[in-house]
Amino acid sequence: MNKLVKLGLAAAGLWAWLGMALAAPEVATETRPIDARVVRVKLDGAVDLRIRQGSTATLILSGDPRWLAKTITVQSGDTLNIDTDIHGRVHLGALHAELTLPALREVSSESVGSTEVSGFSGEELELSLDGAGSMRISCNYKLVSASLGGVGSMHLQSLSGEGVDLNLHGAGFVTLNGRAKWLKADLGGLGSLDAREFAADSVNIELSGLGNASVTAHQNANLNLSGMGSVTVYGKPLNRKVAVDGLGKVSWK
């Protein structure tokens, strides 16, 4: 009797394994044509995108062949648009794009997937994220302008430049890591800013929403609070200017 039970369990396990193997999605790879003029990337749909610096411009897509066929990539001058014409449910992580570019000036995403950017440097980088996706940036630019809407997340790390100009108007969160001469942040939504690990000489915060912010300022801190959120300032700046017209508060650490 025990042998029959064991054989039954083994057979059931084998059929389950075969079912999983047969159900495993097919993965295909495509190389799409682009050239080195591309310095701006606009992303939409359900694509995980990785952008890295390299001497030759290339774009490689991978994923289910049915979804690859509905992934649209169009270059218009210096701008590359990536979108998916997919209706219905798509599992996150099922579509991947590997993009290599010599230079980069702008990344704009309305995707629900993740976007990673690394290895670039230059004068100015413009970032925009709307929706429920995520963006992780590890680059070295003199000036970084970043805008976050929706419920997504943005992580800017290894920063080392003149300044960062941040606009947070959604319910997501932003983390900054590195240093710069100045940080300017306009926080008007429900989201939060964690810049404790971002050392700035001067910090200028306009907070009109419900979110909270943590920043590090070593010389100047100019804070204007008109919402319900609060600001925590590290670094013991010598020059402090605070205006509070709401329920928020300022803490010095």
How would you name each of these model-derived features?
Residues M1-K253:
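Intrinsically disordered, low-complexity terminal regions
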